[in-house]
Structure formats: structure tokens, C-alpha cells
């Protein structure tokens, strides 16, 4: 059946742990991971709950293909009500932690309440225990993992933890595993910190052996891996260059948000690109990139391992940052770089290391810095207030802000609120490039119309991974659509959103969708699970998950007015590139999107839609 069939319920207030049987009826309807975890959350949590209160819950959930031999089967999702947005938060991570939990015999962990003191959860197959984490509180993600592996005398234990950002309530704090893989968005780490939960250490030795039809599963996964290997993106581009290969591509078409979205092209893009990562540095003749790295069971291996110049001003006399470590991804390179006009690759790598070490989302952090730099250049913020000179392009300011925010010091406390709260506090809310309070990723909605609609309607706030229309609008996958045209984009966005929900819930990585469709996922799930997951059924399940998340947000107080974009994208035309003179056509697309979804004009699923999806 592929599901382990068991979940852990941890009451942090009482300090108790109990085992429950997985709800198999829900598993049939929502698969696992994002979908199934969200079903538990929306059933058990009041949508109007304070995200940082003991009444909120936080869930770690794997999918039925997590821990199996399916390519990219290392994913898990952290689900909660997010403090950055007040909406449902489903944040996905790779690495090895998810597979380890599944191999220990667990599908999911539900945490409720709040511990009176710092604790961590230790899982060794069926042995589960809450343990004191007083000695870990205040430690970085890296130190926490080091100490736990040493004290448990097990170098193979996998750790999912928070750093100082989560402890200090940074509203976009991340949950980090394997040192630099993260459930990074929406502030799931802040919820973890609010519960005095420092880490989950897992050791699993059982394996995942309950495959419905092992021979059929082996056959279909082999066939699907072959498709990945032969695809230009998953078999060549991502392994060789990683996601950062998009930097020059997106810049050339005029879709790279620059200086807090004032511009759509960055003159320094080439300096922070994937090509720059493999070019020897002038300072020491060494390349930034050391090698690529794969998550559990992944045949793509898009991860980057890089090494900084030891003489760069950010790491002089800081040997802890000199070794090979988790490298830049495209989104982080953009948010720390182009979004702020910074083209110092070493400074970007340093800020990214701090995001990993302290446990915070580099997208929201970098985009918030962009808003701060604009407020500084406007004269709204001064050096005396923020501690440094912070014009656009300042690598020194970027590094200083990363240190302040991660440690919860000085003006870093305000940067930790996110751009929506910060810009509102200083009288310029329109300068927050966010949706529902969550900062934009690395694509401009004026130059790529579909992604703008995807941002506006995302259930967790601005997000590219909830409906990655870039595949179609830029890369031509599975079909090429014109990025500056709005016709057909509502239907395109819906299709991507629903398919992504199904992939996220399976336990596989969304990057497989560069080569696969839902029709490729279906036979893998059918061979693994004791259910008939046809292509049509998976598409319907994806749509069901999307609408379930939407209804939680509606009940939390979100309405159609929250499906919007910043004023800048709706009224300030792009200055250069293919979209020169254009703004987002969201007002034209949104009503058509609602119609395609089967929602009323207020963005609520109709009775007919609810009945069709069995909500």
C-alpha cells in the first residue's frame, strides 16, 4: 500500500506521544504529504487561530512515494497556519529527512500545544521520545545537527530543525534539514519556535517494503527515470548548472525583477549566474562551484555545493564559512542579488549561508531587504535607524542585514517582520512586493502574465512553485505559450496548480514535471499503492486539494480582494525588454480564472464545485 499506515501525535503541552492509524479514506482522497497533511490541518485547526499560539498545529508529512525507489522520492511537507500570511502554509523540502521518517515506519507527525521548555523529538524506528533541548536552544541549524549526531552517537541520524530565526520569531523562519535543504517559505520555522520545538531527529532502518506490485513498480519507475535522463532540462541543464541557469534566460526576456521590481532587467545578472559559478575567480583562480548534489533517490541532482573565496570581506577571519557548503539556487541568487541590485557573488553566497545557518527563507529575506533599500534611497529610513548605509547594490548592507536578522539584533528585528509589515509601518505599503503578505519569487508578472496570476491566486501567498507556468511561458513545456499574452492563461494556471498539488502530495519533486505529466505519475502511484490512481483521478485530487486549501483561507478571512498584485505591477509599466510599456493584466484574467475554477465572483467554490470534488 506504500503508506506506512501510522502517524505520531505529539502533545507538547502534556509532553505525550501516541500512535494513531492513518486515515485511509482520507489517503485515498488526498494521497499524502501536502494534500493529506492539509486535510488533517483543516479538520483540526480553527482557520482564525493565531498562528503562533498553542492552538495552532504543525505537521510533518510524507507521501506514499517518499522513501521508495521512485526518482526524487525524498520529499516531505511541513503544514501549518502560517504567521507571515495568516493563510495555510505548506512548505516542501528535499534532502534525506523525509525518506528517513518513512523508513522509520511513520507517514506523518502532528504537533499540538506548546512545550513549557525547549524540546526535541527523537525517533528511532518505533522508539519515540521527547527530550530536553535546553542545550540546543540558541544554537544554529548546523550546530544543532552536529550536537545531536554526536550525542546520539549516530552519524546517520537525520535532523529537521530551526535556528535562531525560528527561535526569535522571524516571520519567514524556515525548517532546515541536512544542513541546507529547507521547508523554507511562509514562516513554518516560526511556528516550530513558538512551540519550543527545536528539532526532530530521525533514524529509520525498516525501509519501505509495502509496495503493492514490486515488479510493476520497478518497471514503471525505471521507464520514468529514463524519461528524466533523456530530457534536456532534467537530464542536462539542471544537473550541469542547477536552477541558477535561469538567471541569464529570465534577464534576457526582461522578466528579472530588479531593485524591488522597479526594473525588469539587471545589468549585473551575468555576474550572479550559473555560468559565473563555474568560471574561475579573478581573486584566487578557483571556481565557486565544487560539485552538484542529489537529494534522496534523485536522478536529477540539481543541488549545488560551492566554496567561497576565503579572503572576501564577508568571511575574513570566519573559517566556519570557508568549507564546501550548500550553494546558491536561482531564487536565492535573485532575492539576495538582483532584487537588491547586488552583483557580488561572494556576498550572495555568504548571505545564503547565513539563511541556512540561522534558518530563514532567503526569498522573503532578500525581497524585504529590497524594500528597505528603496525606503533608504527615498530618505524614509536613515543610517542611524538601520545601522548601515543601504543603497541599492550594497553588498556590505546585504551581509549586515543577514547577520542582524538571523541573530534578531537591531534593525534585523524589523526586517524579520517581512516587507508587508515593515513597509506599512513606515508609511509605504505599496513598496511591499508581496501577495497575502508573502514576498514575490524571481519572475516579473508584467513580462510573464501567467505567473502574475499564479502569484495572485496562490493559497500560500506569492509562490512560483504552486503553479510554475514558467515551464510553458518561457521554456515551452509541455507547450509554448507567449509570456506577454493573457489569453488562455487562467486555464493554464489552473492546470499547473492542480497538477502540482498532486505531485507535491505523492512525495516526489515538482522538478520532475519538466519531463513528466500527471500521466507519468499515475502508474507509479498505482503500482505502489492499493488504489486505482488514474490520470483523471489524480487531476481531480489535485483540484480537490487546491479547493480545500482555498476554503481554509476563505474561513480565515481571505476574500477576492486578496487575490491581487502590488500597485507597482498593475500601474507602473515595464521599462525594458519584451514587455516594455506593459503592466500586469490581472484584472482581465482573474474573473476568467474564477470561472475556470467553478468559483463565484467572491472567489468561493460554488455548491456545484464542492459537490463535484466531494469537499
Where do the protein language model's features map onto the residues?
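Intrinsically disordered, low-complexity segments enriched in small residues
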Residues: 1-92, 96-615
Amino acid at each position: 500500500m506504500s503508506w506506512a499506515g501510522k502517524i505520531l501525535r505529539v502533545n507538547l503541552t502534556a509532553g505525550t506521544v501516541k500512535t494513531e492509524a492513518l486515515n485511509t479514506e482520507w489517503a485515498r482522497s488526498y494521497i499524502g504529504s501536502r494534500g493529506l497533511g492539509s486535510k488533517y490541518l483543516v479538520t483540526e485547526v480553527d482557520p482564525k487561530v493565531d498562528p503562533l499560539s498553542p492552538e495552532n498545529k504543525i505537521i510533518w508529512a510524507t507521501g506514499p512515494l517518499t522513501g521508495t525507489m521512485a526518482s526524487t522520492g525524498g520529499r516531505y511537507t511541513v503544514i501549518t497556519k502560517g504567521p507571515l500570511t495568516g493563510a495555510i502554509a505548506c512548505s516542501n523540502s528535499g534532502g534525506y529527512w523525509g525518506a528517513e521518517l518513512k523508513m522509520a515506519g511513520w507517514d506523518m507527525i502532528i504537533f499540538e500545544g506548546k512545550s513549557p521548555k525547549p524540546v526535541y523529538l527523537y525517533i528511532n524506528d518505533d522508539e519515540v521520545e521527547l527530550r530536553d533541548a535546553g542545550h540546543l536552544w540558541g544554537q544554529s541549524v548546523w550546530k544543532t545537527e552536529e550536537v545531536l549526531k554526536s550525542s546520539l552517537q549516530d552519524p546517520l541520524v537525520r535532523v529537521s530543525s530551526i535556528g535562531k530565526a525560528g527561535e526569535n520569531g522571524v516571520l519567514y523562519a524556515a525548517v532546515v534539514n541536512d544542513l541546507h535543504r529547507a521547508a523554507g517559505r511562509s514562516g513554518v520555522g516560526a511556528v516550530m519556535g513558538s512551540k519550543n520545538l527545536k528539532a526532530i531527529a530521525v533514524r529509520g532502518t525498516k525501509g519501505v517494503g509495502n509496495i503493492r506490485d514490486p515488479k510493476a513498480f520497478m518497471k514503471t519507475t525505471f521507464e520514468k527515470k529514463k524519461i528524466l535522463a533523456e530530457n534536456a532540462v532534467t537530464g542536462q541543464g539542471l544537473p550541469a548548472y542547477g536552477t541558477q541557469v535561469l538567471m541569464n534566460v529570465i534577464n534576457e526576456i526582461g522578466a528579472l525583477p530588479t531593485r524591488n521590481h522597479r526594473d525588469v532587467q539587471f545589468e549585473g545578472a551575468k555576474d550572479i549566474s550559473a555560468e559565473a559559478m563555474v568560471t574561475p575567480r579573478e581573486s584566487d583562480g578557483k571556481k565557486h562551484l565544487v560539485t552538484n548534489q542529489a537529494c534522496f533517490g534523485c536522478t536529477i541532482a540539481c543541488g549545488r555545493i560551492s566554496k567561497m573565496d576565503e579572503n572576501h570581506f564577508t568571511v575574513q577571519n570566519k573559517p566556519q564559512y570557508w568549507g564546501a557548503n550548500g550553494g546558491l539556487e536561482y531564487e536565492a541568487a535573485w532575492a539576495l542579488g538582483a532584487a537588491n541590485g547586488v552583483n557580488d557573488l561572494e556576498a550572495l553566497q555568504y548571505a545564503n549561508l547565513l539563511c541556512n545557518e540561522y534558518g530563514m527563507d532567503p526569498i522573503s529575506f532578500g525581497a524585504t531587504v529590497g524594500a528597505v533599500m528603496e525606503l533608504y534611497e527615498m530618505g524614509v529610513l536613515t543610517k542611524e535607524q538601520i545601522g548601515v548605509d543601504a543603497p541599492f547594490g550594497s553588498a556590505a548592507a546585504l551581509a549586515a542585514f543577514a547577520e542582524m536578522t538571523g541573530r534578531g539584533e537591531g534593525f534585523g528585528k524589523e526586517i524579520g517582520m517581512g516587507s508587508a509589515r515593515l513597509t506599512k509601518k513606515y508609511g509605504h505599503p505599496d513598496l511591499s512586493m508581496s501577495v497575502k503578505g508573502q514576498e514575490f519569487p524571481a519572475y516579473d508578472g508584467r513580462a510573464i502574465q501567467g505567473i502574475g496570476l499564479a502569484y495572485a491566486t496562490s493559497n500560500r501567498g506569492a509562490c512560483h512553485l504552486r503553479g510554475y507556468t514558467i515551464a510553458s511561458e518561457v521554456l515551452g513545456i509541455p507547450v509554448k505559450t507567449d509570456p506577454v499574452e493573457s489569453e488562455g492563461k487562467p486555464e493554464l494556471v489552473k492546470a499547473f496548480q492542480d497538477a502540482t498539488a498532486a505531485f507535491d502530495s505523492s512525495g516526489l519533486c515538482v522538478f520532475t514535471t519538466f519531463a513528466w505529466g500527471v500521466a507519468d505519475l499515475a502508474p507509479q502511484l498505482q503500482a505502489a499503492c492499493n488504489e486505482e490512481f488514474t490520470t483523471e483521478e489524480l487531476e481531480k485530487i489535485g483540484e480537490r486539494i487546491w479547493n480545500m486549501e482555498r476554503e481554509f483561507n476563505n474561513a480565515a478571512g481571505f476574500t477576492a480582494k486578496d487575490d491581487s498584485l502590488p500597485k507597482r505591477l498593475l500601474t507602473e509599466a515595464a521599462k525594458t525588454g519584451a514587455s516594455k510599456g506593459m503592466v500586469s493584466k490581472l484584472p482581465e484574467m482573474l474573473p476568467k480564472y474564477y470561472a475556470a475554477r467553478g468559483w463565484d465572483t467572491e472567489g468561493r467554490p460554488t455548491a456545484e464545485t464542492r459537490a463535484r470534488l466531494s469537499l
